Amino acid sequence: MLSPVLLLLAQAAAPPPPAGDVIVVGHRAEQELARCLARNCPPAEEVDASLEASVEQFADGRYTDARRTLQTAIRRNRNYAAELPGPVSSLYATLATVAEHEGDTDLWRTAARNNVLVLRRHLGETNLATLREELSFADSLVGLGAPGAANSAYRTIQQRAAGSGHPGIAAGAAFRRAWLALLRDRFKEAQRFADEAVSLAGTDNRLMADLRELLRTRIAIRKGDEGAIEALAARLRQSADVQPQLLFAPPVADINPPPPPFGVHLNPWHDSRIRFADAGYWIRANGQTAEVEVLRTSGLDQWGPGILRQVRERRYVPLDVEPGHPGIYRIDRFTVRGAMDVPTGSHLRQRMGDLTVHVVDLTETDAMREARRRQTAATSAVKGS
């Protein structure tokens, strides 16, 4: 699971989502995919229909169905990657997200890697779409517990992007290096990378300047200044029409059972079930959350209070809106699962280790679809030039 600021920066590079999107889960996309396959539709249509259906299945909590839909689409259409690099790479990117929430770390890593390889091969290493997905892959390495490999990847991306005329990507990579340094309490190094990020983005780039202030605030908090978040929130304002900027989010309370003094502990949660909860909440004008509630849960009753507490204690950049504005409504999916692995003395994969929490913003689903369409159009323009 990405740290909140890495997730924020990944979202900040994307176009803002349409205001007011609310997810309605049904089976329309699955039916469209079935009709598409029945008439032997062209690869471009099949890929798009498969992506739509997988997002629908994921939102409905049917992670296995979503994975199978994507894997089938990849097998049928990967040979069309030269003509459809953006759509085929999106199949892998979406599969990586599903695999993360399913707990299949090998598939998560492989799918995230293949997403990048498709774009490298067919668009080139310095193409903007490729560099964006390189950042996403490095973010996945953080979530997979490989911060050293992620830092090396960020450094390479920063150099490549700066040398090919993509300062925004270079700045994003530099800031991620700053955040990793902060997590290791290397405050001077973190500040240096944050300064590099602002320099690369340009001094008139408000987002990167705000992110640097956020990093400075987190340094102050680590040094004992608990009022730093309130001071920063008082200085910042953002439009209600753009992606909400997260200032602070505590971890979800850990309810993993304590390890036994002797013997092997078998966690009763380590089974094949998918456990998730969808939390709905408002981000008010002052940047605080309100009316936080669990909209739907599947086997996460014990984790419910911790999830609600985590969302209630978040702090976002205050909104620049008229008095009385209700704010922004969001829905987050929380998945709790152990990773799939093969224990010693067995040949069967099963869930092992501590349970971890993985979060994705369901409010972005429609925006993700629209962004994919824009990426496909941009890819077509590059190939046609």
Positions of PLM-derived features:
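Gram-negative bacterial Sec-dependent N-terminal signal peptides
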Residues: 1-18
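Charge-biased low-complexity segments
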Residues: 14-139, 143-385
